[in-house]
C-alpha cells in the first residue's frame, strides 16, 4: 500500500479488458524514458540449488502470546569516528518537536532530557517499527549515554536492531541523502521469557566499541482494539476507499500507519476479495523487506489496518528527484526486493503490482514492500491465473496476450523496475497506453550505451517474453546466481547487515518531510460513516478481519539456528 493509495488497473477478466485495437488513451507517468528483448545467462549450480533448498527447512518455533518488549538503551563506550568525517558543530540546534518524547523511567515518572544533537544518535528497530534517540548532553562522542526506554508491541517474532550514527556538519545533502556516519550496530534476538531482564554489553559490528542494552518481555492484556487506542497525528495518503494516517498508539507511544477503508465503498466497487487478500498476506508473511501488519480491527462502517510506519519516502519519490540510480544502488534495492518476492512466492502468493510507488525506504535506507491489494493467493508453482491487473508500464507480455500467467510474471516486473532505476524510464514506456502495450509485445529491448554488461545480461533474462524461458522460471535462486549479484552476500543481506548505499534524511519517527504536503497539511480525523445499510450477509464477509494473533517464534537466523536471547553478529 503506497501511502498515496495510488489507483491501478482494476482486476477484470483479460478478454474484455485490454482493447488493444481501440482508440489509444493518453497516460502520463511523470519523468522518465527507454525499451526490451530476451536471452539469459543462467549461472545455475547444483550445489547452490541444494544449499538453497537446505536454507528453506522449517525452523524451530515456539508460541508466545502478544505482549510488550521493553528496551532500555543505556550507553556505548569506545566508539571511533570514521576517517574523513566532519562532525556537526557543537550546540547546533534541532527542532525539539522532531525528537523522541520523554518516556517513563520504569517507575511511571517522565524523564527530563537535554538532547545533544552533535553527539551520536541511535536508531532502534523492532518489526519495522523505528525510533531515533539522541544522546544526553552529559556524555562524549566516544562514550555517549542515552538512558532511554522504549516499549514495542509484540505481535510476532522479530529481531531487535540498534544502529549508531553521527550527524555531519551538513546533515542533509541536496539529493535528500543523510550524510550521517555509521558508527556500528548490533542485532539481538530477544528472549520472550516473561519478566526476565537481560542486561549486557554487546560488541558493535561495522564499527568499534560496545553498546549496553537491557530487554524485558511482558505479556499484554489482549483487549479488542478500537480507534480510541490511537492518537491521530498526520494524514499521509488518501484514496477512494479511505485514507492513511500517521498515528501514535497511546499505551506504548509507538508510531504506526493506520489505513482506514469504508466498507460501503469496498463493496460497491467489488473490491472485497482484494481487501481481504491484502490483510491475509500481511498477516502471514514475516520478512525484513515487507511492511508488517501489527493489528487489524473494524467498526460497523470501516476496516482498519495498523502497519509499521515507514517514513523514508517512496522509492518513486527518490527516483523522480534523482532521475536514475547508479548500478550498485539499483542492485541493492533489487536484491532486497528479490528476497521479498521470493518469500511471497514461497507462500504461494503472486505480487502482481511491483513499482516504485509500492516500495518504501526506512530510516536507514532498506526497502519495505507495501500495498498487497492486487496479490493473488493460493498459486502453486505451475498454477495459472487469467485476470488482468497491475500498472500499465509494468504488465508482462503473457498477461497482455491472455495466455494465463504464473509466479514468473513477477520476475518480468522486477526486470522493468531494474531498467527504470538504471535508465530513468520503464523499457517500453509510452504516454499512449495502447502503443505501450504494442511495444511490450513487439519492440526489441534497447539499452543506453553506459549500462553495465552484467546488468544488460540480467535484464535480458528477466525481460524474456516467453515466461517458460525467463530467468527465474526455475525459481528465485536462478536470479540470485546471476553474475550481476556476484558481490552480494545473501545471508548478510537478509540479516540487514549490509549498509544501504543511501540513507534518507529523517529526523524522527514522526518526521513526515518525505510525504506529500497535500496530505500532511490536512487535519487528521476519523470521519463518521453514515449508515450504509450493509446487510448482515455482507458484514459477515468481514467477520475474520480483526487481528491480534499469538506469535510463532522463529528461532532461526536465515540458515543458522539462534537461541532466543542471543546476539546476532
Swiss-Prot record:
Its EC number is 2.7.11.1. The active site is at 353 (proton acceptor). Changing residue 527 to D: Function compromised. GO terms for biological process: negative regulation of TORC2 signaling; positive regulation of conjugation with cellular fusion; positive regulation of induction of conjugation with cellular fusion; positive regulation of transcription by RNA polymerase II. The modification Phosphothreonine is found at residue 387. The keyword Nucleotide-binding applies. It is an enzyme of class 2 (transferase). Belongs to the protein kinase superfamily. AGC Ser/Thr protein kinase family. This is Serine/threonine-protein kinase gad8. It comes from Schizosaccharomyces pombe (strain 972 / ATCC 24843). The lineage of its organism: Eukaryota, Fungi, Dikarya, Ascomycota, Taphrinomycotina. The gene is gad8.
Amino acid at each position: 500500500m503506497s501511502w498515496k493509495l495510488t489507483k491501478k488497473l482494476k482486476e477484470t477478466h483479460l478478454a474484455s479488458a485490454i482493447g488493444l485495437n481501440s482508440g489509444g488513451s493518453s497516460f502520463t507517468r511523470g519523468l522518465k524514458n527507454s525499451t526490451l528483448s530476451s536471452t539469459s545467462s543462467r549461472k545455475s549450480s547444483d550445489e547452490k540449488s541444494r544449499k538453497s533448498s537446505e536454507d528453506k527447512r522449517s525452523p524451530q518455533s515456539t508460541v508466545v502470546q502478544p505482549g510488550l518488549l521493553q528496551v532500555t538503551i543505556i550507553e556505548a563506550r569506545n566508539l571511533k569516528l570514521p576517517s574523513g568525517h566532519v562532525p556537526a558543530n557543537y550546540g547546533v540546534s534541532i527542532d525539539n518537536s522532531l525528537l523522541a518524547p520523554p518516556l517513563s523511567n520504569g517507575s511511571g515518572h517522565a524523564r527530563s532530557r537535554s538532547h545533544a544533537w552533535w553527539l551520536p544518535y541511535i536508531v532502534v528497530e523492532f518489526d519495522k517499527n523505528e525510533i531515533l534517540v539522541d544522546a544526553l548532553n552529559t556524555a562524549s562522542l566516544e562514550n555517549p549515554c542515552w538512558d532511554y526506554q522504549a516499549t514495542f508491541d509484540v505481535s510476532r517474532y522479530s529481531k531487535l536492531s540498534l544502529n549508531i550514527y553521527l550527524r555531519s556538519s551538513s546533515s542533509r545533502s541536496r539529493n535528500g541523502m543523510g550524510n550521517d556516519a555509521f558508527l556500528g550496530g548490533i542485532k539481538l534476538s530477544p528472549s520472550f521469557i516473561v519478566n526476565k531482564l537481560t542486561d549486557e554489553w554487546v560488541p558493535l559490528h561495522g564499527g568499534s566499541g560496545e553498546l549496553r542494552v537491557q530487554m524485558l518481555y511482558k505479556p499484554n492484556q489482549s483487549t479488542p482494539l478500537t480507534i480510541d487506542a490511537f492518537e491521530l497525528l498526520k494524514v499521509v495518503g488518501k484514496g477512494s476507499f479511505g485514507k492513511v494516517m500517521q498515528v501514535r498508539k497511546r499505551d506504548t507511544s509507538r508510531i504506526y500507519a493506520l489505513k482506514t477503508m469504508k466498507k460501503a465503498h469496498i463493496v460497491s466497487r467489488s473490491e472485497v476479495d482484494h481487501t481481504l487478500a491484502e490483510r491475509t498476506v500481511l498477516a502471514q508473511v514475516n520478512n525484513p523487506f515487507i511492511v508488517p501488519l501489527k493489528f487489524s480491527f473494524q467498526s460497523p462502517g470501516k476496516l482498519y489496518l495498523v502497519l509499521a510506519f515507514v517514513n523514508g519516502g517512496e522509492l518513486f519519490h527518490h527516483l523522480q528527484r534523482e532521475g536514475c540510480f547508479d548500478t550498485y544502488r539499483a542492485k541493492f534495492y533489487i536484491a532486497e526486493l528479490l528476497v521479498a518476492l521470493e518469500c511471497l512466492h514461497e507462500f504461494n502468493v503472486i505480487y502482481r503490482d511491483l513499482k516504485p510507488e509500492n516500495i518504501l525506504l526506512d530510516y536507514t535506507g532498506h526497502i519495505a514492500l507495501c500495498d498487497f491489494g492486487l496479490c493473488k493467493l493460493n498459486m502453486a508453482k505451475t498454477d495459472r491465473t487469467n485476470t488482468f491487473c497491475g500498472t500499465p508500464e509494468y504488465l508482462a507480455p503473457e498477461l497482455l496476450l491472455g495466455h494465463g500467467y504464473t509466479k514468473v510474471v513477477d520476475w518480468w516486473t522486477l526486470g522493468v523496475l531494474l531498467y527504470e532505476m538504471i535508465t530513468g524510464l520503464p523499457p517500453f514506456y509510452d504516454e499512449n497506453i495502447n502503443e505501450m502495450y504494442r511495444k511490450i509485445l513487439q519492440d526489441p529491448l534497447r539499452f543506453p550505451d553506459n549500462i553495465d554488461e552484467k546488468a544488460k545480461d540480467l535484464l535480458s533474462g528477466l525481460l524474456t517474453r516467453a515466461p517458460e524461458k525467463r530467468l527465474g522460471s526455475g525459481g528465485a535462486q536462478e536470479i540470485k546466481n546471476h553474475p550481476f549479484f556476484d558481490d552480494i552476500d545473501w545471508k548478510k543481506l537478509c540479516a540487514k547487515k549490509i549498509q544501504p548505499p543511501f540513507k534518507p534524511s529523517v529526523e524522527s519517527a514522526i518526521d513526515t518531510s518525505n510525504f506529500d504536503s497535500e496530505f500532511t497539511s490536512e487535519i487528521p480525523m476519523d470521519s463518521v460513516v453514515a449508515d450504509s445499510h450493509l446487510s448482515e450477509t455482507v458484514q459477515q464477509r468481514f467477520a475474520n478481519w480483526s487481528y491480534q494473533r499469538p506469535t510463532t517464534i522463529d528461532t532461526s537466523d536465515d540458515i543458522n539456528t539462534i537461541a532466543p536471547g542471543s546476539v546476532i553478529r
